């Protein structure tokens, strides 16, 4: 079974990071991807889905952070690759670059692992991500923090050279994603700086993957879905000769229009979550504007 023919919403790997990928988004939105038609029967087990995506130097999994089923799938992906001896490393958006478990033994305690990764439980509940991390540690595989350290974010905001890391089309797509991702509530003057942070984070994750690469094995990156699209995310910063596979996890009964083959290699659906107004939550958490 290939990634193109598997009945679990896989789409044939397409043009990767090239500019034409951006141009295809409009067409994908209108026509969709025929391989994304929900199957009549249950999808194959996770090990079979993973096998359909191999070989790969890097396997990027874009999740919805508040979907427990996504973290369960991620753990199963780690276990499947580890069981085959094909897991090189696990990289995480949820920990900062420079933190890793390389000095820990497979029998390390969860407390030791959390300390080694500088884990921030307030931002990333260990209850959700601990099983994913420990599956790698217990398999004797290193876990790397991949996110841009918070201390470097301020400098990234003013680093205009980051704009040139993406093509004009991809940069605009990233700016639009930042704008809508913040519920159109950001002043336009903040779109550029916030986009640079996103680019810097994607580049940091890509650098971590490259450093963890091991011939014949796969490095897995677990991140939010916003970091994984081929057209503007982490894949944009990876060498073109590397075999990169991207999986989008979607908590929905049907994939979105932007989940076509130019963006992801496979889309795995999980049960929809209860309705939630994320923009209302975001706006409620923002400080009130000062009175004029």
Predicted regions and their residues:
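Generic beta-sheet signal
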Residues: 56-59, 88, 217-223, 244
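Short internal beta-strands
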Residues: 89-95, 246-250
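Zymogen propeptides
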Residues: 48-83
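N- or domain-start disorder-to-order transition segments that initiate the globular core
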Residues: 24, 28, 32-56
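C-terminal regions of proteins
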Residues: 210-213, 227-292
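Bacterial N-terminal signal peptides that target proteins for export
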Residues: 4-22
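Membrane-embedded segments
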Residues: 67-69, 89, 97-102
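A substrate-binding/cap region within the structured catalytic cores of diverse enzymes
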Residues: 101-214
């Amino acid at each position: 079974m290939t990634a193109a023919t598997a009945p679990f919403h896989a789409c044939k790997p397409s043009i990767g990071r090239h500019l034409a990928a951006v141009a295809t988004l409009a067409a994908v939105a209108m026509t969709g991807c025929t391989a994304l038609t929900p199957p009549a029967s249950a999808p194959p087990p996770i090990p079979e889905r993973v096998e359909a995506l191999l070989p790969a130097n890097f396997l990027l999994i874009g999740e919805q952070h508040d979907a427990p089923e996504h973290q369960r799938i991620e753990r199963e992906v780690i276990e499947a690759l580890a069981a085959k001896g094909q897991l090189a490393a696990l990289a995480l958006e949820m920990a900062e670059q420079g933190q890793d478990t390389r000095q820990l033994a497979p029998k390390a305690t969860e407390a030791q692992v959390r300390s080694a990764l500088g884990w921030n439980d307030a931002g990333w509940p260990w209850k959700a991500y601990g099983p994913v991390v420990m599956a790698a540690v217990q398999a004797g595989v290193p876990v790397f923090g991949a996110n841009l350290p918070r201390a470097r974010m301020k400098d990234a905001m003013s680093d205009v050279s980051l704009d040139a890391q993406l093509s004009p089309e991809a940069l605009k797509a990233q700016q639009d994603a930042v704008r809508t991702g913040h519920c159109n509530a950001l002043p336009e003057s903040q779109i550029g700086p916030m986009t640079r942070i996103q680019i810097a984070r994607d580049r940091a994750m890509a650098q971590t993957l490259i450093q963890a690469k091991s011939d014949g094995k796969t490095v897995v990156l677990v991140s939010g879905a916003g970091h994984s699209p081929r057209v503007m995310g982490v894949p944009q910063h990876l060498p073109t000769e590397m075999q990169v596979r991207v999986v989008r996890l979607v908590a929905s009964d049907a994939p979105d229009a932007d989940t076509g083959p130019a963006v992801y290699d496979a889309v795995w659906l999980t049960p929809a979550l209860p309705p939630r107004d994320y923009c209302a939550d975001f706006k409620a958490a923002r400080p009130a504007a000062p009175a004029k």
